[in-house]
C-alpha cells in the first residue's frame, strides 16, 4: 500500500493510485462485516444465539483496512469484539457463525463463542474477553518471530479500556525497547 506523508492534509491523489477493484473489495469486505454483525445481533435479540455476544458494528473500516495491508503469514490478536477482525483476516463466515451458535463446525468447535475465537491457520492468534489481554499475547508472538528469525508482523487490536491496564504500558514499552514487529491499533 502507498504510504501517506503525515504533513499532507490532502490525499494528493493517493486514492487514484489504488486499483479500483482493490477499493471495491475493501468496500465489499466492510459490508460483509457490517451485515453479518447486524444479522447475528438481530438473532441474538430474539434469543436465538447462545451465550454473550459483542458486536463490532461501526468498526469495520479499521479491521478491513489493517488486514488488507497484511500478508498471509502475518498475525493478529483481537478483543472481545472480534467478529470483524476474524473475517477481515480471512476467517470463514460459516465457521464464525457456527462458532457463535455453539456448533462443532465452528472455528473453535463451538466451545469459544463470540469472545474467544482462534484460527491459527489464518494467523488469528485469538480474541479475549479480558480487557487488554491481547497486548501481551501480540508482544509474545512478535518476540517469537524475532527469536526464530521469521519475517512476519503482529497487529494487535485493542479498545480504549485497555489503556488503563498495566499490560498496555508493559506491552508497548517492551515492544519499543526490543523493536519488535508489532503494530498496536
What are the functions of these language-model segments?
Residues 1-2, 179:
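Short intrinsically disordered, low-complexity coil segments enriched in acidic
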Residues 2-62:
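Conserved acidic/glycine
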Residues 38-42, 46-178:
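Cofactor-binding active-site loop characterized by glycine-rich and histidine/acidic residues
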Residues 178-185:
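A short, conserved beta-to-alpha structural element at the edge of catalytic cores
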Amino acid at each position: 500500500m502507498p504510504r501517506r506523508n503525515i504533513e499532507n492534509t490532502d490525499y494528493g491523489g493517493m486514492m487514484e493510485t489504488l486499483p479500483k477493484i482493490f477499493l471495491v473489495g475493501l468496500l465489499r469486505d466492510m459490508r460483509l462485516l457490517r451485515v453479518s454483525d447486524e444479522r447475528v445481533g438481530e438473532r441474538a435479540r430474539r434469543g436465538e444465539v447462545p451465550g454473550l455476544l459483542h458486536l463490532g458494528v461501526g468498526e469495520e473500516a479499521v479491521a478491513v483496512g489493517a488486514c488488507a495491508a497484511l500478508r498471509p503469514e502475518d498475525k493478529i490478536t483481537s478483543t472481545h469484539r472480534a467478529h470483524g477482525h476474524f473475517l477481515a483476516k480471512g476467517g470463514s463466515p460459516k465457521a464464525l457463525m457456527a462458532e457463535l451458535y455453539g456448533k462443532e463446525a465452528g472455528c473453535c468447535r463451538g466451545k469459544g463463542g463470540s469472545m474467544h475465537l482462534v484460527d491459527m491457520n489464518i494467523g488469528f492468534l485469538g480474541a479475549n474477553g479480558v480487557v487488554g489481554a491481547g497486548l501481551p499475547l501480540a508482544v509474545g508472538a512478535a518476540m517469537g518471530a524475532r527469536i526464530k528469525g521469521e519475517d512476519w508482523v503482529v497487529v494487535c487490536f485493542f479498545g480504549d479500556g485497555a489503556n488503563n491496564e498495566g499490560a498496555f504500558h508493559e506491552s508497548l514499552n517492551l515492544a519499543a525497547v526490543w523493536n519488535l514487529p508489532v503494530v498496536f491499533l
